[in-house]
Amino acid sequence: GAIYGFIGRNGAGKTTCMRMIGGLAKPTSGEISMFGYAGKDLSKVRSRVGCLIEAPGVYPNMTAKENIEMKCRLFGISKKGYAEGILDRVGLLNVGKKKTKNFSLGMKQRLGIGMALVGEPDLLVLDEPINGLDPQGIAEVRDTIQNLCAQQDMTVFISSHILEELSKLATDYGIINNGALLQEITREELLSKCSEKITLTVDNPNKAVPVLDKMGFVHYMIVDKNHIDVYERLNDSAALN
């Protein structure tokens, strides 16, 4: 599964966009299309979308399992062991009868992700799930998302204003500002823009690559028919020349 990182400063429009995708807000103009459906027909595929928008909507005096079971009842799911399976996927299977009001913020976020997984969605929408977490909580949520993508054929749409953290997760990125999508780039393109590098100007990249390989260079990328970006041994410019 792919992880699409939605980047923008606070107030850029990330949450509003995600609320519209989740059916929690209506667009004032334009059109939303998902899974080949648009407009009023979106109701046919809303069940294929799981959302965690802003704070997790959990019952504080219930356990993690009870919260998942409540969501299951709303979805008409009565399969035995289903709630336990969800909790296992988000790393909360062994929290026992601990009330969610006593959970850490990271645990609450993972429970929120678990509740969004009820119904086995094809698209998981996560609105700044690492916002406000300590380093351990960030790592736990990141591991949960990565494990879900590795185990299931699921697309994750995740927003954040922390580019450094999203760079450890996402495979593709969209950059938004003032409600407008400015750019879409791949992870490789993002790393290229953010990394220190030396750009080589060559006549033929296909002839230059074997030379780089022979010299022991591994981290490089062909940009176009006349340029190669090199990301290692930057102080070794004499050898590159």
Q: Where do the protein language model's features map onto the residues?
A:
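Conserved ABC transporter NBD signature motif
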Residues: 30-40, 44-45
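Conserved ABC ATPase "signature" region
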Residues: 69, 73, 80-95
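Catalytic Walker B motif of ABC-type/P-loop ATPase nucleotide-binding domains
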Residues: 124-128
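Conserved catalytic motifs of ABC-family nucleotide-binding domains
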Residues: 120
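ABC transporter nucleotide-binding domain
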Residues: 142-232
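Helix-to-loop junction immediately C-terminal to a conserved catalytic motif
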Residues: 22
